[in-house]
């Protein structure tokens, strides 16, 4: 079984919606939480968020993974300055321009039910490097979880990805803001 990763503007929007499913957090959020802020993503306007995502898909801001032709995974990737939540976050110990559009950010993964634990997120994390570089990024960064060995994670925490997936792809840890979170970066 081969996992392929493509920029989202090279696949059907229906593939993204298949990955998100009809219910649950991904279907409700439409990957707008980091773009709109947490309160706005919980409004009842799912259709409005879906249309925002459609526009981002046209711009190529994201990746889709297929397993033997079946859509199985999504990863949000765009200039860091596109994410309102990241611009509003306090960055203790980091002194850089949050609006620098040459730094791209990976904020969210969705793996379709029935296809988890098969390397989908790892393939997507690795795929962000070429896509960001091709779009003119100077670097790509992510904010993954680093759960303690043998410890359970709370439902939904891993939507930002696992630290190990990014390290395996060649990202370097640049900051550790908490015991369970790292900031990783791949410089071009």
Predicted features and spans:
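Conserved hydrophobic beta-strand within the GNAT/NAT acetyltransferase core sheet
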Residues: 106, 140-142
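Conserved acyl-donor/pantetheine-binding loop and adjacent beta-alpha core of acyl/acetyltransferases
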Residues: 66, 71-116, 150-160, 167
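Conserved acetyl-CoA-binding loop-helix of GNAT-fold acetyltransferases
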Residues: 106-111, 117-134
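Short hydrophobic/aromatic beta-strand or adjacent loop that forms the aromatic wall/cage
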Residues: 60, 179-184
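A short helix-loop-beta-strand connector motif used in the catalytic cores of GNAT acetyltransferases and
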Residues: 41, 47-64, 81-87, 105
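Conserved N-terminal entry element of GNAT/NAT acetyltransferase domains
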Residues: 1-39
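Conserved active-site alpha-helix within GNAT-family acetyltransferase domains
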Residues: 133-138, 146-176
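Active-site beta-strand termini and strand-to-loop segments that position acidic
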Residues: 66-68, 185-188
């Amino acid at each position: 079984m081969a996992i392929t990763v493509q920029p989202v503007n090279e696949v059907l929007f229906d593939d993204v919606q298949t990955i998100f499913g009809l219910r649950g957090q991904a279907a409700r959020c439409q990957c707008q939480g980091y773009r709109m802020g947490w309160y706005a993503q919980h409004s009842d306007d799912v259709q409005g968020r879906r249309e925002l995502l459609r526009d981002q898909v046209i711009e190529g801001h994201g990746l889709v993974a297929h397993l033997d032709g079946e859509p199985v995974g999504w990863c949000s990737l765009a200039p860091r300055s596109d994410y309102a939540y990241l611009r509003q976050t306090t960055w203790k110990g980091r002194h850089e321009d949050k609006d620098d559009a040459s730094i791209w950010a990976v904020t969210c993964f969705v793996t379709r039910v029935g296809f988890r634990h098969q390397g989908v997120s790892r393939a997507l994390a690795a795929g962000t490097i070429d896509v960001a570089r091709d779009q003119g990024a100077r670097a790509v960064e992510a904010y993954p979880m680093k759960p303690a060995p043998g410890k359970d994670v709370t439902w939904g925490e891993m939507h930002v990805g696992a630290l190990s997936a990014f390290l395996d792809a060649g990202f370097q840890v640049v900051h550790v803001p908490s015991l369970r979170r790292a900031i990783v970066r791949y410089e071009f």
